[in-house]
Amino acid sequence: MEAMAASTSLPDPGDFDRNVPRICGVCGDRATGFHFNAMTCEGCKGFFRRSMKRKALFTCPFNGDCRITKDNRRHCQACRLKRCVDIGMMKEFILTDEEVQRKREMIMKRKEEEALKDSLRPKLSEEQQHIIAILLDAHHKTYDPTYADFRDFRPPIRADVSTGSYSPRPTLSFSGDSSSNSDLYTPSLDMMEPASFSTMDLNEEGSDDPSVTLDLSPLSMLPHLADLVSYSIQKVIGFAKMIPGFRDLTSDDQIVLLKSSAIEVIMLRSNQSFTLDDMSWDCGSQDYKYDITDVSRAGHTLELIEPLIKFQVGLKKLNLHEEEHVLLMAICIVSPDRPGVQDAKLVEAIQDRLSNTLQTYIRCRHPPPGSHQLYAKMIQKLADLRSLNEEHSKQYRSLSFQPENSMKLTPLVLEVFGNEIS
């Protein structure tokens, strides 16, 4: 047979397409990989090893150029060995018996170590996987990444008080689905009595009735952002109701937890739309892109805005998985140390279940380096939220004390955050 070009260099496995069948360079059978510096089948690999170890001397009974195939490779050992050498197989690559034994022991040890490591590696239990699945579903049902409902709020008015001008705002439309929109707006908020939180049956679809007026005051964004916060409270209520164990609490404890955590969870939720590029909350269109000026136009000062932005930046940089994000929101809501909680032990038991799930998830699913101290950093964010909550309450009390501001808020906002006007 014609001699093929011999190769004595180590081929690069990357040069071979994994989808192309690999052929033994000796006999044409299906190759299993590179053996002793050449692509061969298991049969020719074993033949070459045995021949080299025995230092066998073969003689061709014919003229020394037999064509070696899968079917006749046993007929002429001399030409088969010659073919092995021609394609680049080298005896220097053959391990001694001692080396083979050491290699086998190393492989066995590595397998045992991997098995031990795998047995010690934390795994999410079925219950924990179920908790995560429920919370993800709850979040998807209560957070619309298209922000389509924002067009139903009172319009965002970015007023220039010095000139009396205002920026363009979206055209209001109240024509939509009557089942969802007909009760959302009435001509005047003065006609409304603030609804009792306890009588709302924790209904995330509860209605708020803001008035639609053109506001050129320094607080021109207050009506729009009040509607946004009211809408977010409804969604937080909906999310909380689906937290495993939350419905086991008394109605009083549910209300206490929701009232005390609402603004914190809203701040957590808003991180999904927060952008590091320009430190703003991007909710779809330019009209619904909010910056610190917009927050100040709703009556808040830098004492709240600066730590809020710092919090948003820090949380964004943690690069949380969605699973971690929803668990953090649930842990935030179900906090046994909230003032007024009656059955703190039950609340703590629910929170512990959520916290353990979060810790296990981080160890199982969040690869380093992002997972380093991640749980501790997330818990610190909850502490930061408490401080933000306190400052928000202080500024809200000051804001809502003025009747002209209080009347721009919604009944749900007044009920959750308090009504300073008696």
From Swiss-Prot:
Disulfide bonding pattern of the chain: none
PANTHER family the UniProt entry points to: NUCLEAR HORMONE RECEPTOR, VITAMIN D3 RECEPTOR
Xref: InterPro entries: DBD_VDR (IPR042153), NHR-like_dom_sf (IPR035500), Nucl_hrmn_rcpt_lig-bd (IPR000536), Nuclear_hormone_rcpt_NR1 (IPR050234), Nuclear_hrmn_rcpt (IPR001723), VitD_rcpt (IPR000324), Znf_hrmn_rcpt (IPR001628), Znf_NHR/GATA (IPR013088)
Function of the protein: Nuclear receptor for calcitriol, the active form of vitamin D3 which mediates the action of this vitamin on cells. Enters the nucleus upon vitamin D3 binding where it forms heterodimers with the retinoid X receptor/RXR. The VDR-RXR heterodimers bind to specific response elements on DNA and activate the transcription of vitamin D3-responsive target genes. Plays a central role in calcium homeostasis. Also functions as a receptor for the secondary bile acid lithocholic acid (LCA) and its metabolites.
Domain of life: Eukaryota
Family membership noted in the UniProt record: Belongs to the nuclear hormone receptor family. NR1 subfamily.
Compartments in which it is found: Nucleus; Cytoplasm
Subunit-level organization: Homodimer in the absence of bound vitamin D3. Heterodimer with RXRA after vitamin D3 binding. Interacts with MED1, NCOA1, NCOA2, NCOA3 and NCOA6 coactivators, leading to a strong increase of transcription of target genes. Interacts with the corepressor NCOR1. Interacts with SNW1. Interacts with IRX4, the interaction does not affect its transactivation activity. Interacts with CRY1. Interacts with CRY2 in a ligand-dependent manner.
Bilayer-spanning residue ranges: none
Motif 9aaTAD mapped to chain: 411-419
Region Hinge, residue ranges: 97-126
Name of the protein in its database record: Vitamin D3 receptor
Gene Ontology biological process: animal organ morphogenesis; apoptotic process involved in mammary gland involution; calcium ion transport; cell morphogenesis; decidualization; intestinal absorption; intracellular calcium ion homeostasis; lactation
GO molecular function: bile acid nuclear receptor activity; calcitriol binding; DNA binding; lithocholic acid binding; nuclear receptor activity; nuclear retinoid X receptor binding; nuclear steroid receptor activity; vitamin D response element binding
CDD domains in UniProt: NR_DBD_VDR (cd06955), NR_LBD_VDR (cd06933)
